[in-house]
Amino acid sequence: MARSAKKGFYVEASLMKKVVNAIESKSKKPIKTWSRRSTIFPEFVGFTFQVHNGRQFIDVYVTDDMVGHKLGEFSPTRTYTGHGSEKGKKK
């Protein structure tokens, strides 16, 4: 179920503070975050975020097309290895 429209978009306060500080200082250093649930705002465009996927941090460069999506959508948590291998099977 989607979030109620009257509540608005969610972004973690600490993440927004980091972005505002980066804008004021004109810093292009990656912003490290564990907040996968935060919505990408237009102010985030052009910044690189290091989003935690449970094991490591994945670099995510934010573009215009990503606005409105969640940061976690661009940091996969699972690796697909495929179903069975043909290698080693005998005919």
Curated annotation (Swiss-Prot):
Q: Does the keyword Cell cycle apply?
A: no
Region of interest (Disordered), ranges: 72-91
Q: Which is one Gene Ontology cellular component term of this protein?
A: small ribosomal subunit
Q: Name one GO molecular function term.
A: structural constituent of ribosome
Record's keyword annotation contains RNA-binding = yes
Q: Which Pfam family would be a valid example here?
A: Ribosomal_S19
One GO BP annotation of this record: translation
Keywords for this protein: Ribonucleoprotein, Ribosomal protein, RNA-binding, rRNA-binding
Q: Note the superkingdom of the native organism.
A: Bacteria
Similarity comment text for this entry: Belongs to the universal ribosomal protein uS19 family.
Q: Which PANTHER family match?
A: RIBOSOMAL PROTEIN S19P FAMILY MEMBER, SMALL RIBOSOMAL SUBUNIT PROTEIN US19M
What this protein is reported to do is described as: Protein S19 forms a complex with S13 that binds strongly to the 16S ribosomal RNA.
Question: What is this protein called in UniProt?
Answer: Small ribosomal subunit protein uS19
Gene name, per UniProt, is rpsS
